[in-house]
């Protein structure tokens, strides 16, 4: 006979909400090192001061790790139960780069399927949806309009200037 009480009473491991703690627990490849001081500073300030705020801008120089910062913020939101979350890139090429970056760091991302549907991991708040501007801002958006839409809790827009230019082009 199986005693299911032992199985059901197991303590569920708590997911980290603090993005710095979260990073230390990721199943990342051995080629990745610790967070850079700038990344830690931005993540700490976001977590301690700006976490509940909307419409934030993170501005850093090229190569300072904005992609990882954005992914950690979104993963933190998912761990908090605040999904679904979307990471938007200005084009497909950069989305592919971010996909491999996320995999390298052990952050679960999902992609819109070939038949333009949302993956269940995204809908259930278990993975970050990684996409690019043209998939979202077009005349046939799969995110929906009116009463038929996909709820999204948090969005990170990588390289916002380039994304905004692509959005303008889509509607002119």
Each model region followed by its residue ranges:
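N-terminal helicase ATP-binding lobe
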Residues: 1-172
């Amino acid at each position: 006979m199986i005693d299911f009480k032992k199985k059901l009473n197991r303590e569920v491991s708590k997911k980290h909400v603090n993005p710095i703690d979260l990073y230390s627990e990721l199943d990342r490849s051995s080629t990745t090192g610790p967070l850079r001081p700038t990344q830690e500073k931005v993540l700490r300030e976001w977590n301690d001061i700006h976490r509940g705020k909307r419409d934030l801008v993170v501005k850093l120089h090229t190569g300072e790790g904005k992609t990882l910062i954005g992914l950690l913020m979104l993963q933190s939101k998912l761990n908090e139960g605040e999904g679904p979350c979307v990471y938007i890139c200005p084009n497909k090429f950069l989305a592919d780069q971010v996909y491999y970056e996320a995999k390298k760091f052990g952050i679960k991302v999902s992609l819109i399927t070939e038949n333009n549907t949302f993956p269940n991991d995204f809908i259930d708040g278990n993975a970050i949806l990684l996409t690019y501007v043209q998939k979202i801002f077009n005349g046939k958006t799969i995110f929906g309009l009116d009463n038929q839409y996909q709820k999204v809790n948090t969005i990170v827009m990588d390289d916002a200037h380039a994304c905004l230019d692509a959005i303008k082009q889509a509607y002119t």
